[in-house]
């Protein structure tokens, strides 16, 4: 998967189109990423005992994972943020590195 934890991404489709956020977690097996402030959902939690005592029930707002095809990487070029696709290349030592397709720079 070309998007990693800690990357700054922009949503390109869906209800949150245009929003930017940092990737909190990546789930490569499901091809999904968790982006802060994007795809917020409300979960109804039941009150019940926990290890530390009682837990109050209620409605909790949290982020839900979105498919990696719905986000694009955002990189900085000349002080501007540019949305780009991600490619790979091998450097001089033979290590595989990510490359921003639009700028041609290593990520």
Swiss-Prot record:
Pfam families: KOW, ribosomal_L24. One of its GO terms (molecular function) is rRNA binding. One of its GO terms (biological process) is translation. One of its GO terms (cellular component) is cytosolic large ribosomal subunit. CDD domains: KOW_RPL26. It comes from the Bacteria. Keywords: Ribonucleoprotein, Ribosomal protein, RNA-binding, rRNA-binding. NCBIfam families: rplX_bact. HAMAP family: Ribosomal_uL24_B (MF_01326_B). Part of the 50S ribosomal subunit. Belongs to the universal ribosomal protein uL24 family. One of two assembly initiator proteins, it binds directly to the 5'-end of the 23S rRNA, where it nucleates assembly of the 50S subunit. One of the proteins that surrounds the polypeptide exit tunnel on the outside of the subunit. This is Large ribosomal subunit protein uL24. The lineage of its organism: Bacteria, Bacillati, Actinomycetota, Actinomycetes, Kitasatosporales.
């Amino acid at each position: 998967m070309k998007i990693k934890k800690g990357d700054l991404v922009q949503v390109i489709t869906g209800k949150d189109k245009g929003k930017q956020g940092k990737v909190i977690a990546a789930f490569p097996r499901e091809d999904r990423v968790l982006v802060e402030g994007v795809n917020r959902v409300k979960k109804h939690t039941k009150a019940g005992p926990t290890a530390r005592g009682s837990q109050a029930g209620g409605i909790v707002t949290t982020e839900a994972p979105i498919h990696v095809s719905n986000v694009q990487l955002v990189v900085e070029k000349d002080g501007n943020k540019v949305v780009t696709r991600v490619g790979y290349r091998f450097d001089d030592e033979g290590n595989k590195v990510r490359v921003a397709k639009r700028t041609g720079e290593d990520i």
